[in-house]
Amino acid sequence: IHHVKTYTLDVLKYKNIFDYIITKTWLSRSRDEKSIPWHIHACAHISFVYYLNTPPKSHKLKFMNPHHKNSLWLGNKEGKYDHLKMIEEHNEINAETFFLHPPEGHIALFPSTLHHSTESIDGFVGERLAIVGDITCVLKKEYLQFSTGFISPQHWKIYQG
């Protein structure tokens, strides 16, 4: 949770008003050249990937820029027809996607509603292993007066259906 607090407080610049609940985790295993399609984690606030094993040419983690604020024309995507595009060099300012090649032992933290996927790389051999999970931010007890934000499940009343 230390990294999540650092991300929330120092990177995103939120106030220190949250407790953090890991709501689910799973093991991600990639053994072939199949990619994971674009998706979000709608039931969480922060998602994480902790890379246990990253062989050479293992999948890259891709993120989609949902705003395209610096795109002058639609259709200037990165891809196999780059020679037909108007952009000299894709970077974090003009690209609609960006990616990471996370090293072993790296943890990636990102907003759960940020579209993301994985993309395989030709020649990948081996198995990429990662622990993946979702975190929900809940208001600390002394900050329940905020009109938005989740309250801790300890204050919930659950009715069995």
For each feature predicted by the language model, list its residue ranges:
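Surface/interface-facing alpha-helical segments and adjacent flexible terminal/loop regions used
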Residues: 1-4, 151-161
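A generic structural signal for short, non-catalytic loop/turn and secondary-structure boundary residues
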Residues: 15, 20-21, 54-56, 124
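Catalytic core of non-heme Fe(II) oxygenases with the double-stranded beta-helix
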Residues: 30-109, 119, 126-127, 131, ...
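Glycine-rich nucleotide phosphate-binding loop and flanking beta-alpha elements
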Residues: 116
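Signature of the catalytic double-stranded beta-helix
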Residues: 1-34, 38-41
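Sequence-level detector for tyrosine residue identity
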Residues: 7, 14, 20, 50-51, ...
